[in-house]
Design a protein with these regions (language model features):
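Conserved acidic carboxylate
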Residues: 8
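Two-component/phosphorelay signaling modules centered on CheY-like receiver
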Residues: 11-29, 116
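Acidic catalytic/metal-coordinating carboxylates
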Residues: 33-36, 59-63
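Conserved phosphotransfer cores of two-component systems
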Residues: 42-44, 66-74, 89-94
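Active-site beta3 strand of CheY-like receiver
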Residues: 45-50
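Receiver (REC) domain active-site loop signature in two-component systems and cognate sites
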Residues: 55
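Alpha4 helix (beta4-alpha4-beta5 surface) of REC/receiver domains from two-component response regulators
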Residues: 62, 82-100, 107, 111-114
Length: 119
């Protein structure tokens, strides 16, 4: 299956999503903020970046810009619980696959990941 980097500052959500995606057969790695996520992207090869938008150190918008510049083929799926953050992601339409609204149910994030990987 796919190798997915999950970048989310909320520990419980990050590990919850990682466990669910591993049950689907994906390999997952985790990062707690955008800077750590970018470092992991530079050290590995990933099929998908699944990132929260609102995080400390480096937010998901900046991470998406830098990740897409360094890795043009990388698929990016963002998550947010804030409407204004979703609007900020509109500028990334050419760089990301979609934005998933939080809170979400497990079937929702699994479907979003499957769609992103198929895109």
């Amino acid at each position: 299956m796919a190798k997915i980097l999950i970048t989310e500052d909320e520990d419980s959500l990050r590990s919850f999503v990682a466990r669910a995606l591993r049950l689907d057969g994906h390999e997952t790695e985790e990062a707690a903020d955008g800077a750590e996520g970018l470092e992991k992207l530079r050290d590995g090869v990933y099929d998908l970046l699944l990132s929260d938008i609102r995080m400390p150190v480096m937010d998901g918008i900046e991470l998406a810009h830098q990740a897409k510049s360094a890795f043009p083929a990388l698929k990016i799926l963002l998550m947010t619980g804030y409407a204004e953050q979703r609007e900020r992601a509109d500028d990334l339409a050419e760089k990301i696959v979609d934005v998933v609204s939080k809170p979400f149910a497990l079937p929702d994030i699994r479907k979003a990941v499957a769609r992103a990987l198929a895109a």
